[in-house]
Swiss-Prot record:
Record-annotated FAD-binding FR-type domain positions: 15-124
Function: Part of the ABC transporter complex IrtAB involved in the import of iron-bound mycobactin (Fe-MBT) and carboxymycobactin (Fe-cMBT). Has a preference for Fe-MBT over Fe-cMBT. Mycobactins are then reduced by the siderophore interaction domain to facilitate iron release in the bacterial cell. Transmembrane domains (TMD) form a pore in the membrane and the ATP-binding domain (NBD) is responsible for energy generation.
PROSITE patterns with a match to the protein in the record: ABC_TM1F, ABC_TRANSPORTER_1, ABC_TRANSPORTER_2, FAD_FR
Organism, as annotated: Mycolicibacterium thermoresistibile (strain ATCC 19527 / DSM 44167 / CIP 105390 / JCM 6362 / NCTC 10409 / 316)
More details: The import function of IrtAB is contradictory to structural predictions, which suggest that it has an ABC exporter fold.
Enzyme Commission number(s) of this protein: 7.2.2.-
SUPFAM superfamilies: ABC transporter transmembrane region, P-loop containing nucleoside triphosphate hydrolases, Riboflavin synthase domain-like
Protein's UniProt name: Mycobactin import ATP-binding/permease protein IrtA
InterPro entries given in the database record: AAA+_ATPase, ABC1_TM_dom, ABC1_TM_sf, ABC_transporter-like_ATP-bd, ABC_transporter-like_CS, FAD-bd_9_SIP, FAD-bd_FR_type, FNR_nucleotide-bd
A GO term from the CC aspect: plasma membrane
GO MF annotations in UniProt: ABC-type transporter activity; ATP binding; ATP hydrolysis activity; ATPase-coupled lipid transmembrane transporter activity; oxidoreductase activity
Spans annotated as Siderophore interaction domain: 16-245
Family statement: Belongs to the ABC transporter superfamily. Siderophore-Fe(3+) uptake transporter (SIUT) (TC 3.A.1.21) family.
SMART domains, alphabetized: AAA
Length: 908
């Protein structure tokens, strides 16, 4: 079978045929068929991800030897058995793919390739995920869209715009997602789909678009010009072209396909019949309708919409906004570096001229003049480079001083929940590593990148002036290098995207393995084996990826070595010199500068990598600077905020009034909670993991601001209290005891820095930790920190002493015995009983045994209060709490060991 030029190109790039046999086919809709196939070799090189696709070579319906390439998304896959399936739209008039799909029978075979497929993935770090996904397509791209919908987390909204070309398009099923909205758009012309996009703020959304080519062009223009989508936040690829039956064809007489056909599916497409109705039918048959209600239809292109589009802001552009004040200095530094690079190259040119004069027997005076000029240029280049570096360091010092001030001010105003969500390592990277990366970007990256680009270009121009024939030959190893790199990139496929995910996953596995060594060595044979298996899997991944490239990488290294360029120069130049067509002196610039030409070109990539690293750091810093702060509201005009009578005015009263909270817009984790904590009482929060216990308690301490409703302490909305005012009223003891680097006394007195030693000792005695402190080498002056020698229970008692000294009327307590060692659990419970005496306590209960004497037990489920009462009342009611109690298994995933028989319950 003939496949034409593109078939040859694909084979040259390393693509290989896999024979696939048809197993069966199933009509999903009258014009939409699923073909199931099996191939014994396909999954040896294919890694299936959402939107992954395969190239099929379809026979010519007219019976010629020509084969036609089409690409289709993988909708089902089983690598173990080699089975897979693709969904195909049956177009009229039918092209090669549609004809094959209509007539194929089980047992038929077809050639399949996997070259060029690009999978879709959701960032693993929640901080890097978009606010939502905007999906745009039609029946041809629906299989890929379904793959995306299936992997998008359920807390992320999806807006789906589907262009309707046929009445039966509504019968094609869509994947389910709780936050999916479907907009059906009738096609009047190529602009219909773009015109239907909602006028709204699309800030930090990601767009995946795969409609017909004409519609895609209009969509991309509107996304860019009206909504401000940055290029990197849009994946756009036409899945077919209206009016072109073949899309892209290959054969002995066919025209080569467009390059785009190599990188994304181009479905075979004659113009489908347009939908007859003028309206926009709703997708009644989609599974999503069962979970989201009737999907929202898009407005018709002519429907009234707001006239002014809203240009969004994306995290991808945050780095540019942060560096905007440095735009002029960075441009000036680039121009200066270009000039300095030319000055530094000039002595080499003069050296060549000096050699010419020496060979020509020139006078000594001319030689001295030329030599002194070269030396002067070397000195001038060094002085200018030093002056520019000094100036850039001054610019960086001023910018870094101002930026660190802004960053520290911002960190002091961020909610505490921001820090608990990110962790100390991420914050350290922000303050230390990212600011250091910015230093390199400002002072070195731009000059390095400019020098890396200007130097080889200037050398190339000079060599072409010296002799264009030899200069042209120097491109041979460069082209070999680029071709090999392209082949490796294409053959790597989805493994390029998988590599950083593997590295991140193994970093986490290695950290957990090292941290858990004491337990793993004693009990953890399975854990150690699991880590070794993961490590073996990672090594297998790297070997399977890199082993086929050993020969290519060796050749790439050889063709870019100076010795290779020297041989090429000699092979090309010597015959020209021997035959008298080239002056021997003209070989000198090639011998001086041409041998390093390859290294100079490769330096461009290294120079640009510094800019990329710096821009990523700038993006992370600006993203933090854009985070919403905890704002202290003005009490004036805050209706319903303050109360001046009754229990609500008594110290220690906490009221939650119709409180709701969302980490992500539209995904509530606390739902309409109303609750009162009376002064001097203990309220326990219980419920299954993920019910919202910790989140609700964190809201009382204002780790986050409520989305709706209000929380009042002593009758005042906590949003009207400064941090100092709030934390004089509300204290908290976390399950993970936090100590700072400092003395024992300093750790206990964090909330009261002016407290005398006697008060500190009294608090320590009440917390049952005084005797342990006195046994330490320096007593209360002993230095503690994250790696102190105190046991878990002893560290918890230090934090309890801190809370006792703070003496807040309200206390949020994350059950502190969950990690206590057996020797200290009783002491921790005694300390808690002293701490909770005569205070309003909200305790997050991980074990029901510890809160049986609480004044009020609140049972949460899915962010809602489902039961409230005392232990006896809730047992008698026979509801959710009774079920938890009877099961005897209630505990959080981190609850630790069973409670000891001597444990003292909170509230007793």
């Amino acid at each position: 079978m003939a496949r034409g030029f593109q078939g040859v190109m694909l084979r040259g790039l390393g693509a290989r045929d896999h024979q696939a046999t048809v197993v069966d086919k199933e009509y999903i809709a009258p014009h939409f068929v699923r073909v199931r196939l099996v191939s014994p070799t396909l999954f040896d090189e294919v890694i299936v991800e959402p939107t992954s696709w395969l190239r099929f070579w379809f026979p010519d319906p007219d019976g010629s030897d020509t084969e036609f390439q089409r690409a289709y998304t993988i909708t089902e896959s089983d690598p173990e058995t080699g089975r897979f399936a693709v969904d195909m739209v049956l177009h009229e008039p039918a092209g090669p793919a549609s004809t094959w799909a209509r007539t194929v029978e089980p047992g038929a075979t077809i050639a399949v390739m996997s070259m060029g497929s690009r999978g879709f993935s959701v960032p693993e770090d929640p901080e890097d995920r978009p606010v939502g996904y905007l999906l745009i397509g039609d029946s041809a791209s629906t299989p890929a869209i379904n793959g995306i919908i299936e992997v998008v987390p359920h807390d992320i909204p999806i807006e789906l715009y589907l262009e309707q070309h046929h009445d039966d398009d509504v019968l094609i099923p869509l994947a389910e997602h709780p936050r999916l909205r479907v907009h059906r758009v009738s096609r009047d012309d190529a602009s219909s789909l773009a015109a239907a996009l909602e006028l709204r703020d699309w800030s930090n959304w990601y767009c995946w678009a795969g409609p017909e080519a004409g519609a895609l062009k209009q969509v991309r223009t509107r996304l860019r010009d009206e909504f401000g989508f940055p290029k990197r936040e849009v994946y756009a690829q036409a899945y077919w072209t209206e009016g072109r039956a073949m899309g892209s064809s290959r054969g002995e007489t066919s025209t080569p396909a467009k390059p785009a056909a190599k990188t994304a599916p181009a479905k075979a497409a004659a113009k489908p019949a347009a939908a007859s109705g003028a309206g926009t039918p709703e997708h009644a048959a989609a599974p999503a309708a069962a979970t989201t209600g009737a999907p929202q239809a898009a407005p018709a292109p002519g429907a009234a919409q707001p006239r002014t589009p809203v240009r969004g802001r994306w995290r991808a552009e945050a780095g540019s906004r942060l560096l905007a004040p440095l735009k002029k200095p960075l441009i000036v530094s680039g121009v200066l570096q270009a000039l300095i690079t030319l000055i530094e190259l000039a002595p080499f040119v003069l050296l060549v001229e000096l050699a010419r004069l020496l060979l020509g027997g020139a006078e000594a005076e001319r030689l001295w003049t030329l030599g002194l000029t070269a030396v002067s240029l070397i000195g001038l280049g060094a002085v200018l480079a030093a002056a520019m570096t000094l100036w850039l360091h001054r610019v960086d010092a001023r910018f870094a001083h101002e930026l660190r001030g802004r960053l520290l001010t911002k960190l002091s105003r961020l909610p505490l929940g921001w820090f608990t969500r990110r962790g100390s390592a991420s914050t350290k990277q922000l303050v230390q590593d990212d600011t250091l990366a910015l230093h390199y970007l400002i002072t070195h990256a731009i000059p390095d990148a400019v020098a890396a680009v200007v130097a080889p270009v200037a050398v190339l121009v000079y060599l072409f002036v010296a002799d264009w024939r030899v200069a042209l030959v120097l491109f041979i190893p460069v082209l070999v290098y680029l071709v090999l790199m392209s082949v490796m990139t294409i053959q790597s496929g989805s493994k390029i995207a998988q590599a950083p995910r593997w590295a991140e996953r193994m970093g986490g596995e290695a950290g957990a393995f090292l941290e858990g060594q004491p337990v793993i060595r004693i009990f953890g044979g399975a854990a150690a084996s699991r880590f070794r298996r993961r490590l073996d899997d990672y090594i297998d991944f790297l070997v399977s990826w890199q082993r086929p490239f050993v020969g290519k990488k060796t050749l790439m290294d050889l063709v870019t070595r100076p010795a290779t360029f020297l041989w090429i120069i000699l092979v090309a130049g010597v015959p020209l010199v021997v035959t008298g067509r080239m002056d021997p002196v003209n070989l000198l610039p090639f011998l001086l500068l041409g041998t390093t030409f390859g290294a100079r070109l490769l330096g461009i990539g290294y120079g640009l990598s510094g800019i990329q690293t710096g821009m990523l750091a700038a993006r992370r810093i600006q993203t933090v600077l854009d985070e919403p702060e905890l704002v202290v509201r003005d009490r004036t005009g805050q209706a319903g905020t303050d109360h001046a009578s009754g229990d609500q005015a008594r110290p220690g009263t906490v009221e939650l009034d119709r409180v709701s909270f969302e980490y992500r817009p539209g995904v509530p984790v606390i739902r309409d909670v109303t609750l009162t904590l009376r002064p001097g009482t203990v309220t326990a929060l219980v419920g299954p993991s993920g019910s919202g216990k910790s989140t609700l308690a964190a809201l009382v301490a204002r780790f986050h601001d409520v989305t709706q409703g209000a929380i009042r302490v002593d009758g005042r909305d906590i949003r009207t209290l400064t941090a100092d005012e709030l934390y004089r009223r509300v204290g908290f003891v976390l399950q993970d005891a936090q100590l700072v680097h400092g003395s024992v006394a300093e750790n206990i007195a964090l909330a009261e820095p002016d407290a005398g030693l006697e008060r500190i000792r009294t608090a320590a005695r009440d917390a049952q930790i005084h005797d342990r402190i006195t046994r330490m080498p320096d007593g209360y002056d002993s230095v503690l920190g994250a790696g102190s020698a105190l046991s878990g229970g002893e560290r918890q008692r230090v934090t309890i002493a801190r809370a006792i000294l703070a003496d807040t009327p309200v206390l949020v307590l994350d059950e502190a015995t969950a990690f206590a060692d057996p020797e200290s659990e009783y002491l921790v419970q005694q300390a808690i009983n002293r701490l909770t005496r005569d205070r309003t306590v909200l305790v997050i209960a991980h074990r029901l045994h510890t809160i049986t004497h609480a004044d009020q037990i609140v049972v949460l489920d899915d962010g809602r209060i489902v039961e409230v009462g005392t232990h006896d009342e809730l047992l008698a009611a026979g509801g959710r709490y009774r079920g938890l109690w009877d099961s005897g298994r209630y505990s959080s995933p981190d609850a630790g060991r069973p409670v000891s028989a001597d444990a003292v319950e909170v509230g007793r």
